[in-house]
């Protein structure tokens, strides 16, 4: 039997496999924190594994980023447990809202692996929950500290990001839980415009994020979610299982970041970009340098 054709075919397949670009594609959603985290992850891979990294940052909202990961357009991106639970898996939040962060993480980890062969790595260390924010002068004048107190006060001119209006853990459920009244329809806008709208008095109450850098730079008050409506939103890198298999040291490389970013640290990183207008890549590089001191 002439084995030459078989050997030639196997050789061609082997050469084709070897010629495939060995790279990791890092994605992110389309707001500052995600782009900063995408850069941190990308640079961590580059400096540790020394493999090429393609960046597909600023992809869009949650469902677009998730679909890109499932389809293999990207290899990994940072996600939040509460977002995965409610917006992606369509599961109800824990009855106690803020609930057990470890239980929510276990639920989304198991479901992602079972349904899509996606792996949740250990959390980065911070919890970016939604934050309902008013101007500081408003909170002081009306003696507001909680969402329940805001609900009893008066109807609110409200601003929110586009995704928050559509999410099961978003606007509609919040209004029902607190019997919060709005003055007209809430104004939808990009997340980066919320604080400007609040400062210019276009709106009086915004649905923002607890790790927003601008929150610490302005005179604002974050109203306490006293009915624990929002679930935990621990942030972690989610990766394709086949990508982790192709790069045996990738998981260890990324989990070296686990627990390294506190709420306050993430807020500061965001402020460096949004408040001081520094490039996300520069802020990410500076952060990584502090880890090796």
Q: Could you describe each region identified by the protein language model?
A:
Residues 2-7:
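N-terminal export leaders
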Residues 16-17:
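C-terminal motif of bacterial Sec signal peptides marking the signal peptidase cleavage site
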Residues 21-34, 51-57, 154-160:
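Short, well-ordered beta-strand elements
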Residues 32-52, 172-176:
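Short, polar/charged alpha-helical segment
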Residues 62-64, 68, 73, 78, ...:
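The structured alpha-helical core of multi-pass membrane proteins
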Residues 81-176, 180-189, 204, 209-267, ...:
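Contiguous mixed-secondary-structure segments that line small-molecule binding/active-site clefts
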